[in-house]
């Protein structure tokens, strides 16, 4: 690919990015990413987070979901966040930087959770996309499987789970596994999710031990 083509492609992306209504709105409201609107839309429909709850936020950086979660959970709530990337501090959020796929990071996260059960597990995790579906989709499905496994380890009875999933190979099987673990599972496509994206959010409530 020539430099000229790269420049043209980058310019189109930048134009789309800066013209994006949700990016501008996030900047105006002091939110760290447009992703914050996705969890706000889910919260508006499904009322997952209430004051005093303990929330785990996986794939948290740069912190859009954690910003929303800590506001909803309030002073008596608790938000524990994890990401492989660094994240600037958010008051009320206990952040762990590390690769969630690694056992030592999972152990450190479980230590921070402690003996108390968690009310909500959020996951906006996604792999670095290569553009090759046969590579990207298995990586994405592996992350959501780890997120569901986290639910099995820490979620309280009747707890909630919201997870980003990319439609494709393995999606139906994953949906089945989530339905087996929760009383109710809904598929959400927030308005703030770009229409061309294959991402959807599974919102599961009523965790069954």
UniProtKB/Swiss-Prot annotation:
Entry annotation: catalytic residues: 164 (proton acceptor)
Class of this enzyme: transferase
NCBIfam families for this protein: PRK11188.1 (NF008390)
Lineage: Bacteria, Pseudomonadati, Pseudomonadota, Gammaproteobacteria, Alteromonadales
Primary subcellular site in the record, as a coarse category: cytoplasm
One CC-aspect GO term: cytoplasm
Family designation: Belongs to the class I-like SAM-binding methyltransferase superfamily. RNA methyltransferase RlmE family.
A Pfam family per the record: FtsJ
InterPro entries for the chain: RNA_methyltr_RlmE (IPR050082), RNA_MeTrfase_FtsJ_dom (IPR002877), rRNA-MeTfrase_E (IPR015507), SAM-dependent_MTases_sf (IPR029063)
EC code: 2.1.1.166
Keyword rRNA processing in record: yes
Source organism of the structure: Shewanella halifaxensis (strain HAW-EB4)
Binding site residues for S-adenosyl-L-methionine: 63, 65, 83, 99, 124
UniProt entry keywords in alphabetical sequence: Cytoplasm, Methyltransferase, rRNA processing, S-adenosyl-L-methionine, Transferase
GO molecular function: rRNA (uridine-2'-O-)-methyltransferase activity
Protein name per the record: Ribosomal RNA large subunit methyltransferase E
Role played: Specifically methylates the uridine in position 2552 of 23S rRNA at the 2'-O position of the ribose in the fully assembled 50S ribosomal subunit.
The keyword Transferase appears for this protein: yes
Catalytic activity: uridine(2552) in 23S rRNA + S-adenosyl-L-methionine = 2'-O-methyluridine(2552) in 23S rRNA + S-adenosyl-L-homocysteine + H(+)
Subcellular location per the Swiss-Prot or TrEMBL entry: Cytoplasm
């Amino acid at each position: 690919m020539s430099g000229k083509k790269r420049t043209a492609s980058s310019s189109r992306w930048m134009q789309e990015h800066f013209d994006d209504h949700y990016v501008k709105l996030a900047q105006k409201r002091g939110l760290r990413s447009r992703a914050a609107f996705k969890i706000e839309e889910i919260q508006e429909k499904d009322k997952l987070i209430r004051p005093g709850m303990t929330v785990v936020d996986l794939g948290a950086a740069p912190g859009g979901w954690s910003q929303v979660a800590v506001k909803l959970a309030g002073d008596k709530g608790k938000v524990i966040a994890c990401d492989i990337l660094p994240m600037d501090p958010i008051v009320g959020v206990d952040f762990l930087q590390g690769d969630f796929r690694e056992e030592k990071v999972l152990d450190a996260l479980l230590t921070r959770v402690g003996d108390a059960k968690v009310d909500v597990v959020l996951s906006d995790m996604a792999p670095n996309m290569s553009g090759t579906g046969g590579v990207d989709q298995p990586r994405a499905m592996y992350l959501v499987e780890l997120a569901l496994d986290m639910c099995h380890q820490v979620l309280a009875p009747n707890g909630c789970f919201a997870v980003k999933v990319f439609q494709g190979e393995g999606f139906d099987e994953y949906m089945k596994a989530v339905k087996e673990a929760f009383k109710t599972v809904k598929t959400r496509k927030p308005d703030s999710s770009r229409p061309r994206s294959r991402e959807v959010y599974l919102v599961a409530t009523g965790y069954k031990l």
